[in-house]
């Protein structure tokens, strides 16, 4: 089962996804987390994104490449036999790239190779309630 979690940066998605995984594991249900920036391309993408030097079109391709590599590492039987929890997925690609002025249909097209989520959750939190993870 493919379950996705979306929401603003620092809204608690990663913490929530980890808690859900732990809960499933306690119940004896196999669960795994996948999130952006875990592949080699993803790690480089994170560095470049922090520098702010990436063109929005290139970002769309690189995020899709990172997602593609992560999906290639997931066997089809895993999608049937375990809970796959994604901390960000295609909706984030659409939201971020459209906010940068990239055409919705174009972004949708390059992400059309990815399976549709079985269920998705959007963590809706007020801006002032976001978790401050940059304390130090």
Describe the predicted segments one by one:
Residues 10:
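Walker A (P-loop) phosphate-binding loop of P-loop NTPases
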Residues 13:
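Conserved lysine of the Walker
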Residues 16, 20:
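Hydrophobic positions on the alpha1 helix immediately C-terminal to the Walker A/P-loop
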Residues 23, 29-112:
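ATP-dependent small-molecule kinase phosphotransfer cores
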């Amino acid at each position: 089962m493919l379950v996705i979690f979306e929401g603003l940066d620092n809204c608690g998605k990663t913490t929530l996804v980890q808690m859900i995984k732990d809960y499933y594991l306690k119940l004896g249900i196999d669960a795994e987390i996948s999130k952006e920036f875990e592949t080699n391309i993803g790690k480089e993408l994170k560095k470049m994104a922090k520098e702010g030097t990436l063109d929005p079109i290139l970002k769309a391709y690189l995020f899709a490449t990172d997602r593609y590599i992560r999906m290639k590492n997931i066997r089809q039987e895993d999608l049937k036999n375990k809970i796959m929890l994604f901390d960000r997925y295609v909706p984030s690609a659409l939201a971020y790239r459209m906010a940068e002025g990239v055409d919705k249909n174009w972004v949708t097209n390059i992400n059309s190779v990815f399976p549709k989520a079985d269920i998705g959750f959007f963590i809706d939190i007020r801006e002032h309630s976001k978790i401050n993870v940059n304390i130090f």
